Amino acid sequence: MDLSAQTFFSLDQFQHSAIFQGTRYAWEALEALAEYLKKQRLGKIEIELSSSVYLVNKEFISIGKGVMVEPGAYIQGPCIIGNNSIIRHGAYVRGNVITGEACVIGHASEVKHSILLNHACISHFNYVGDSILGNGVNLGAGVKCANFRLDHKLVSVHAGNEKIITRLKKLGAVIGDGTQIGCNCVTNPGAIIGKNVICHPCLTIGGYVPSYGKVKPAQKSIIVEK
């Protein structure tokens, strides 16, 4: 099964597509992320910031043109915030993060060691750790990308009949372009979700979900008289 970055993402318009070069599996870009950021010329902030925006390791933070950073946001370098993105009040950017253009990191949303391609949105009460979100991905309110196994073993990726043991103790989700995840879903460590998938709310999603699929609950709620 082809689990390369090109299977999940259109990279033509993503400024940092080079991070995927030489990878066999899409998630291998996360292994290269810290080193990739070290090689970038960081520290260029192209907007005016409120005095109540909290910056840590400012010399390793780059913020592009047209970005809106609301008062009360926390941004830790190294990171790159792409042009025309929005970082809302209470957002927590923990470092080793790249966002493409016009991304949204919203109130009470936390992101660390992750890559967000253009127009990806984590707008309300989300956790995104050690994950890659494709172009136009939207996480509904309360969606969490779990990234660490309870038994502390290396994360495995299950796709079809394949079980791929990664080199990673922390791996969240790889979510393909255009996928929409409903409110309060949790993705298990190593979840691989294809392009243009729709996931209904309040589900636990693991393993491999093929592109253009739909994930919905196995049973429906029943309304009865008292």
Q: Where are the model-predicted features located?
A:
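Terminal amphipathic alpha-helical/low-complexity segments used for targeting or macromolecular assembly
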Residues: M1-S52, N196, C202, S211-G213, ...
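Glycine-rich hexapeptide-repeat left-handed beta-helix
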Residues: H16-I19, H107, H113-H119, S123-K226
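Long amphipathic N-terminal alpha/beta scaffold segment
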Residues: A32-N83
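Fold-independent oxyanion-binding glycine-rich loops
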Residues: S52, K65, G72, H89-G90, ...
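Glycine-rich beta-solenoid repeat tracts in large extracellular/virion proteins
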Residues: V53-V56, Y74-I75, Y92-V93, E110-K112, ...
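Residue-level "contact hotspot" at macromolecular interaction interfaces
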Residues: F60-S62, I80, I98, I132, ...
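Glycine- and small hydrophobic-enriched segments that form the cores of compact globular domains
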Residues: I61, V67-T99, C103-N118
